[in-house]
Regions:
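A residue-level marker of the well-folded mature domains of exported/periplasmic proteins
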Residues: 1-159
Length: 159
């Protein structure tokens, strides 16, 4: 797997970003995770012009482009309800002013199943994996140094 990463420094759509994304698609990139507000529009336009795919962010962005294969969604409703619950039960002082990470067990992350378009991974597969993440039997660890090997991964930092 080749993984290229670019910090956009802006949430704005631009012809420069669309041109760069088009170049990535032309050089073999299959999917771009367009994480950053309106920059999604530039990446989706490049994907449409190059038979590419896009992963949306924050909400289900499938209605914005036929190129969206899924979206990494924040469970905004669940997280707001969780925080408001802390206010109403009198325990907000436990979380106020602190950094809190919510995840699968809190229904605070997910993929949109109603607009599912992935072909090699089913909604049932996803739901089974999400349930394991929520119950703790599958732990997602961001410490890549624990991997047996990264020989099949190439990381390109684009500046």
């Amino acid at each position: 797997m080749n993984y290229s990463w670019l910090y956009g420094a802006s949430f704005a759509a631009s012809t420069e970003l669309q041109t760069m994304a088009s170049g990535w698609y032309e050089n073999g990139t299959e999917v771009i995770f367009a994480c950053g507000g309106n920059m999604f529009q530039s990446v989706a336009a490049a994907a449409a012009a190059n038979d590419g795919a896009v992963v949306g962010v924050d909400v289900d962005q499938s209605s914005q482009s036929d190129t969206v294969i899924t979206s990494a969604m924040k469970g905004l409703s669940a997280s707001v309800q969780w925080a408001c619950g802390k206010v109403y039960d009198g325990s907000f002082d436990e979380i106020g002013g602190t950094f809190v990470t919510l995840g699968a067990k809190d229904n605070a992350v997910g993929l949109p199943t109603a607009t599912w378009s992935l072909t090699k991974w089913t909604v049932d597969d996803y739901n089974a994996m999400l349930a394991k993440m929520a119950d703790g039997s599958l732990v997602v660890d961001n410490d890549y140094s624990k991997l047996d090997s990264t020989d099949s991964l190439t990381l390109n930092l684009v500046k």
